[in-house]
């Protein structure tokens, strides 16, 4: 069996070792059998001379919540940046809503219904909260406008209180809320969060996860990377574990959370 392949079954899939007897690929119950929103096959990517991704296969269904796990340096952020077009894949295929997206620019991929909140937030410090939000507002890929400025401000009361403040006047947690709110105003089909809670105060972290849960409940698919694996697994349907740029385990998040041997082996916890 190739390192990134899983066979059909009820549990998780591990390519070897203590968990190697489990087989299967989790599918969100409500969307089992639905055409994938995103499908990547055989993705390879490099940074300079370094070969980072080695034949990654990943699919995400409509409304599915997926947690991307692995130790630091295993390729999680590179995979996300490759999916968004910021890193050019050296080989493989990428389809978003059935459209070939491998050669598209990041803005073109975003127009297909993907929204990305990177590490570092990327807000505009000289624009107000209102301006930061409104510059991103648009209808979704199917024309819907479920997430409006009013809905984002209701979800993030702190932003409503600072609506006229410049981005540079916000705390780190408020800037992260602004970045997520701006992404939601694109009315995405898939929201990708890369280390959304890193370095934030615990009460802000709780607020971020509350919003992640609300986004999931609204039917938007999510792909989440975060160092707090317990929170990731508690807010997702399925886990995908990377090691050295390869998928080494995929299965239900609840299975991963209950498997201490798996967590020790691949996350070092």
What are these regions (language model features)?
Residues 183-184:
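ABC ATPase C-loop
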Residues 48, 66, 104, 129-147, ...:
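ABC-type ATPase nucleotide-binding domains, specifically the catalytic core motifs of the NBD
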Residues 166-170, 174:
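Conserved ABC ATPase signature
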Residues 6, 23, 92-100, 112, ...:
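Conserved ABC transporter NBD signature motif
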Residues 84:
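Helix-to-loop junction immediately C-terminal to a conserved catalytic motif
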Residues 69-71:
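The feature captures the beta-strand-to-loop junction immediately N-terminal to the Walker
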């Amino acid at each position: 069996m190739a390192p990134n392949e899983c066979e059909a079954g009820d549990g998780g899939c591990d390519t070897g070792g203590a968990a190697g007897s489990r087989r299967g690929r989790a599918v969100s119950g409500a969307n089992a059998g639905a055409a994938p929103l995103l499908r990547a096959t055989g993705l390879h990517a490099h940074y300079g001379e370094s070969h980072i991704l080695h034949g990654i296969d990943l699919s995400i269904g409509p409304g599915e919540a997926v947690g991307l796990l692995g130790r630091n340096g295993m390729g999680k952020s590179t995979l996300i940046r490759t999916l968004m077009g910021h890193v050019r894949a050296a080989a493989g295929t990428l389809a978003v809503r059935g459209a070939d997206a491998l050669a598209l620019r990041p803005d073109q991929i975003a127009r297909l219904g993907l929204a990305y909140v990177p590490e570092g937030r990327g807000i505009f410090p000289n624009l107000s909260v209102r301006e930061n939000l409104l510059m991103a507002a648009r209808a979704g890929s199917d024309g819907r406008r479920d997430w409006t400025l009013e809905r984002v401000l209701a979800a993030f009361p702190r932003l409503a209180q600072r609506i006229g403040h410049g981005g540079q006047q916000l705390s780190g947690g408020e800037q992260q809320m602004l970045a997520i709110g701006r992404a939601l105003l694109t009315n995405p089909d898939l929201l990708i969060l890369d280390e959304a809670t890193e370095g934030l105060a615990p009460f802000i972290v709780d607020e971020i996860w509350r919003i992640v849960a609300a986004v999931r409940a609204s039917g938007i698919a999510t792909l989440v990377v975060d160092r707090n694996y317990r929170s990731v697994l508690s807010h997702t349907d399925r886990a995908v574990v990377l090691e050295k740029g390869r998928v080494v385990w995929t299965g239900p998040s609840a299975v991963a959370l209950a498997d201490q041997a798996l967590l020790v082996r691949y996350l070092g916890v």
